[in-house]
Amino acid sequence: MEEYQKKIKEKLNVVPLEPGCYLMKDRNDQVIYVGKAKRLRNRLRSYFTGAHDAKTTRLVGEIRNFEFIVTSSETESLLLELNLIKQYQPRYNILLKDDKSYPFIKITKEKHPRLLVTRTVKKNSGKYFGPYPNAYSAQETKKLLDRIYPFRKCDNMPDKLCLYYHIGQCMGPCVYDVDLEKYAQMTKEITDFLNGEDKTILHHLEDRMNKASEQLDFEQAKEYRDMIQHIHNLTKKQKIMSSDNTIRDVFGYSVSKGWMCVQVFFVRQGNMIKRDATMIPLQQTEEEEFYTFIGQFYSLNQHLLPKEVHVPKNLDKDIIQSVVDTKIVQPVRGAKKDMINLANHNAEVQLDNKFELIARDESRTIKAIEELGERMGIQTPIRIEAFDNSNIQGVDPVSAMVTFVDGKPHKKDYRKYKIKTVEGPDDYKSMREVVRRRYTRVLNEGLPLPDLIIVDGGKGHMNGVMDVLENELGLDIPVAGLQKNDKHQTSELLYGASAEIVPLKKNSQAFYLLHRIQDEVHRFAITFHRQTRQKTGLKSVLDDIDGIGTKRKTSLLRTFGSIKKMKEASFDELRQAGLPEKVAKNLQNALQNK
């Protein structure tokens, strides 16, 4: 299993069973798909288990990470999904890139307005509500409104009254004069209803239901009762969409175990188009930490100031106003307060995820070192020190040591070594020198000894290290070797005087830990070697000799192993190394004068 797959698997375990949106990312951290879910954990897990169609299989093959945002309802998830798709334009959201894919309810801007379901949004042509998740949902809502509010139904004004007038769903403007204030009142009530304020419409329906019951028209009463139930199911407040176009940023935060998470929702044209999440180690009170953060948010991070900044009520508005030069709002009720609550909740979820992942990681690493000790037949190796050499044909040879404590990198104990006593590319002698230097100093300074030493190499490296430890320094520390396969991947762990293979499953936590250790020490050694080469620029006596360029210099070092060996070589041996007569003479003269 690849490392990114393991990380995804760990993250899936801490995703909440709540509605929300998720963002799938590729190896370049680009959002390639945005989706919504009633239960985030179940939906996200479904991508990584079982069979899929061809398109989903391609998508899953590109996923390297994911993020999620918790919402309060499925409706909010839909609205947020649309906003995120608009922002990121993910290539796997082909059907969702345009709002035309989703239906809206529209009250037309006409003398005698109509109530329509449309997939096309045109500016200044009416009032729009939505989008709705599908046409059925929009049509059912319109059908409900048609039975309560008698807007005009015909596209063109007819010459006589139609059926809708006779069933009470039109006021008959084709024949009768209609009070335009009545239209304005109906538009207001529909606007309130579709924005979550359903008390007025429910009051109308309950009156009609009661009257129908009094008149023993139970069928009609049942119809009104069903309409009331439909409204209860439909009208979930849509906190992700605002009823105005004010540009605002909404802040929420949560604090736990010495950390603060601040969530910022960016609301533009009524839509939450983006969110920012920042983790901060607490150095002061949570209020003081927030004031510092929000002041830096608009100055150091260069975020544009919105028309309004919404913050939780417990904060000091005057202090925030002193560092943020815009209108500060602290909502106490309604949709705006709900948005603050949602930001707080997302911050809380993110903190919980952080600590859950840390706990899982700690549990995993402790199990890994326990398993490693058990398989090797030694005490649990709490402290592990690993060594690796790096050089190019013996030029600028270096070595590096990394330390893992409780299965995690302990970077303050990392060490770098320049090889001092070995000439040429001799891995065994280089390893002996570095181990000798390291543990001589450990003994002299009373530093902690490791429970296990790991060398990047096989039996020869192990024997050299054990000889130095036991016969020169009098130390008894377990020594293991890590070998790689032909693909340069961690292959097997060797241990004991005969360097026997330790039986470890490739998918075990212990093997994964060894893989991390080998990768880390190799990275550290390679980085140090690169830095050393950059400083010296591979500078040597060879650089000043006519006729010897980079290729010949590399070839000579490969053939002789060191400058010292070249100096000891005869003229004929230099010629046999492929040098022209004149260049061989130049080299011999230069080395003899060195």
Swiss-Prot record:
Molecular function terms, GO-annotated: DNA binding; excinuclease ABC activity
Keyword Cytoplasm: yes
Record SUPFAM superfamilies: C-terminal UvrC-binding domain of UvrB, GIY-YIG endonuclease, RuvA domain 2-like
Gene Ontology process terms (BP): nucleotide-excision repair; SOS response
Sections of the chain in a coiled coil: none
Compartments where located: Cytoplasm
GO cellular component, one term: cytoplasm
Keywords, comma-separated and alphabetical: Cytoplasm, DNA damage, DNA excision, DNA repair, Excision nuclease, SOS response
tRNA processing found in the keyword field: no
PROSITE patterns found in the cross-reference section: GIY_YIG (PS50164), UVR (PS50151), UVRC (PS50165)
Domain GIY-YIG: start-end pairs: 17-94
Domain UVR: 199-234
NCBIfam families: uvrC
Family: Belongs to the UvrC family.
Subunit structure: Interacts with UvrB in an incision complex.
Task of the protein: The UvrABC repair system catalyzes the recognition and processing of DNA lesions. UvrC both incises the 5' and 3' sides of the lesion. The N-terminal half is responsible for the 3' incision and the C-terminal half is responsible for the 5' incision.
Protein name, UniProt field: UvrABC system protein C
Annotated organism of origin: Staphylococcus epidermidis (strain ATCC 12228 / FDA PCI 1200)
Biological classification of the source: Bacteria, Bacillati, Bacillota, Bacilli, Bacillales
